[in-house]
């Protein structure tokens, strides 16, 4: 064991050494660094197994982003910053859909399987619009219902038959219409209009013929018998002379040997012939 005097001498020296070990040596302050455009360097402090970093003594210099800029102070923006917004703002703007005007939205009548429904700025309300199913939807819907398929085929065939009958009737009517070029092609509308005009012309023609027959001469009635007139004396004398001349011009019949009346008339003629030169 040391004497008490030696212990008294050793005591202050040990306490001084302990204080020197415990007290940190003052480190020289680093010179101020010029401001650079890059981010400030931060001194990394290792973790000692704990989730929060250990507290440093007040004398150790530490650069912190929170203490470097006081709250409430806005950073001055340069011309480049004002002309070109940050990438963060561009990303946020890209996610939101741009607002379109009324005429840029899809038309409500063009809705189909591949085109979505009309936007909120549609012209007509969506409750009044009925979307027509496409051919694919009809095929899928009717594939499991054979009755509807058969009914549709029957309806289509009946419609084709009706259309053929209508076309045939128009063709027959076209043959009855007189046109200047006989082989002139006419539409159904023109055929109907020409048929109406032609029918009106025929009606007027029949009326004119009936009016002409009504205004013509009277039909022939029963014939009247001719009236017999009594001839005068002069007419009688003329007729007698004509009869005598006709009798003279006729030849006399031959006389019979038995003394027929023809033989008795013969001497009379001879006497007349004999007397005739004397009369002259």
From Swiss-Prot:
Q: Which GO terms describe its molecular function?
A: DNA binding; DNA-binding transcription factor activity, RNA polymerase II-specific; protein dimerization activity; RNA polymerase II cis-regulatory region sequence-specific DNA binding
Q: A Pfam family matched by this chain, by name?
A: HLH
Start and end of every bHLH domain?
150-202
Regions of biased composition (Pro residues) lie at 25-40
Compartments annotated for it: namely:
Nucleus
Which InterPro entries does this entry report, sorted A to Z?
A: bHLH_dom, HLH_DNA-bd_sf, TAL-like
CDD domains associated with the record: bHLH_TS_LYL1
GO BP term, pick one: definitive hemopoiesis
**Which segments show compositional bias classed as Low complexity?**
257-267
Lyase as UniProt keyword: no
Q: Where is the composition biased (Basic and acidic residues)?
A: 229-245
Which Gene3D superfamilies does the record associate with it? Helix-loop-helix DNA-binding domain
The record's listing under SMART domains reads:
HLH
Carries keyword Ribonucleoprotein? no
Q: Which GO terms describe its cellular component?
A: chromatin; nucleoplasm
Keyword vocabulary terms for this entry? Chromosomal rearrangement, DNA-binding, Nucleus, Phosphoprotein, Proto-oncogene, Transcription, Transcription regulation
**Which residues does this entry mark as bearing Phosphoserine?**
260, 276
- Region (Disordered) spans which residues? 1-60, 214-280
Quaternary structure and interacting proteins, as annotated: Efficient DNA binding requires dimerization with another bHLH protein.
Disease annotation reads:
A chromosomal aberration involving LYL1 may be a cause of a form of T-cell acute lymphoblastic leukemia (T-ALL). Translocation t(7;19)(q35;p13) with TCRB.
Kindly provide the name given to this protein in its UniProt entry. Answer: Protein lyl-1
Q: Which organism is it from?
A: Homo sapiens (Human)
